[in-house]
Amino acid sequence: MSGYARRQGAPPLSRTRSLVVPDAPAFYERRSCLPQLDCERPHGGDLHPHLFGFRPTFMCYVPSPVLASVGDTGFGYGKGKCTNQGPSGAPETRFGGDKLEDLEEANPFSFKEFLKTKNLSLSKEDTTTSRIYPKEASRHPLGLEHSSPASQLMGYGLESQQPFFEDPTRASNLEEDEDDGWNITYLPSAVDQTHSSRDTQDSPPCDTYLSFFSNSSELACPESLPPWTLSDTDSRISPASPAGSPNADFAAHEESLGDRHLRTLQISYEALKDENSKLRRKLNEVQSFSETQTEMVRTLERKLEAKMIKEESDFHDLESVVQQVEQNLELMTKRAVKAENHVLKLKQEINLLQAQLSNLRRENEALRSGQGASLSVVKQNTDVALQNLHLVMNSAHASIKQLVSGADTLNLVAEILKSIDRISEVKDEVDS
């Protein structure tokens, strides 16, 4: 999944080697060598009816290579912490990260609870038969050590287990059925496939599988487990009965016990299957949420890139505007300098004009002072000019008369010239 780093060389989730359902407080301790998964655990609400009223509390220890394949999810790796972002009020399931008092609650998948359930179911049967045979009583604990969940506690991969005591009777078939039932109960489908594929090859020793969980001192042994309490119905085989042919009572008891055990295993299998489906749904939700967040991040990156491009273009526009403003300021500065120079020139011209104006004022005052003395001279000049004009007029009249008389003479000469042309023409006609 994009957006999260995956560890190199991590195998797929289907290669999960073991799922431990602990029944002792030692298995509730945190182990620094093992990664733990903390998921949500129900703190309230109605309990599922198929869990017999018990609250499902179990703990998964998964090898680190297997957990690395789930690195894309939102679960905490290696620290046993996880923050689920589910809706408020939803039921939660926690794996291995609860407090000690929460982990010490009743575990329906533990060996103790299995013993209690089996003792309660066996006590309700017919108590009239009270035959106890030492051979059968000694066989049951030994067979239990082989087929009990304590052996399953070591992990799914413990296929090299050998019983401490093998009875040639048909009870061994019952123990094999119980082993098969436990394998079906605690093995998911993906682990079953890997489990069956490893059967065809050389299986590593049990110590390699036990190293995934803890040292051998921490593993639950038959001495640390509560003893198997046999009821009246647990030993119905007569000592005189042959080893290969148990009586009808034991066959009926075996059948009822197997059916009851099968129902219990089916219920636990369904519970684990539901829990597996819930975890898968949560994983799908986390993956979808991660994809949504990745798409949102990509959208935000695109928006941020577009915004950065827009800001860059705005920055370039602002730079051009600033440059233009600087050019305008320089031009205005030049214009201001020119205006100052022009003002200086105008001031100088004003000073010159003021000087000329003062001179003209002085001349005007002088003329006004000398105007009274020059009036008599002006009158004399005007009289002389009038006399001269009269003389010119008289001479002009005389010349005009002469011109008129000269014009009359010119008209007479023109008439004479015209008559000369006529006289010549008449003479020519007479000659012809």
UniProtKB/Swiss-Prot annotation:
The keyword Ribonucleoprotein does not apply. Residues 126-143 have a biased composition (Basic and acidic residues). It comes from the Eukaryota. Found in a complex with ENTR1, PTPN13 and GIT1. Interacts with PTPN13 (via the FERM domain). Interacts (via N-terminus) with GIT1 (via N- and C-terminus); this interaction is direct. Interacts with NOD2. Interacts (via N-terminus) with IFT88. Interacts with VPS35. It is found in: Cytoplasm; Early endosome; Endosome; Recycling endosome. InterPro entries: ENTR1 (IPR026757). Signal peptide: none annotated. May be involved in modulation of TNF response. May be involved in presentation of TNFRSF1A on the cell surface. Involved in the endosome-to-plasma membrane trafficking and recycling of SNX27-retromer-dependent cargo proteins, such as GLUT1. Involved in the regulation of cytokinesis; the function may involve PTPN13 and GIT1. Endosome-associated protein that plays a role in membrane receptor sorting, cytokinesis and ciliogenesis. Involved in the endosome-to-plasma membrane trafficking and recycling of SNX27-retromer-dependent cargo proteins, such as GLUT1. Involved in the regulation of cytokinesis; the function may involve PTPN13 and GIT1. Plays a role in the formation of cilia. Involved in cargo protein localization, such as PKD2, at primary cilia. Involved in the presentation of the tumor necrosis factor (TNF) receptor TNFRSF1A on the cell surface, and hence in the modulation of the TNF-induced apoptosis. GO terms for cellular component: centrosome; ciliary basal body; early endosome; midbody; recycling endosome; retromer complex. The modification Phosphoserine is found at residues 18, 148, 241, 245. Phosphorylated. It comes from Mus musculus (Mouse). Residues 174-196 are annotated as: Required for interaction with PTPN13. Its main location: cytoplasm. Keywords: Cell cycle, Cell division, Cell projection, Cilium biogenesis/degradation, Coiled coil, Cytoplasm, Cytoskeleton, Endosome, Phosphoprotein, Protein transport, Transport. Belongs to the ENTR1 family. This is Endosome-associated-trafficking regulator 1. Tne N-terminal domain is necessary and sufficient for basal body localization and ciliogenesis. The keyword Cell cycle applies. Residues 126-145, 226-250 are annotated as: Disordered. GO terms for biological process: cell division; cell projection organization; endocytic recycling; positive regulation of cilium assembly; positive regulation of protein localization to cilium; protein transport; regulation of cytokinesis. Residues 262-289, 315-370 form a coiled coil.
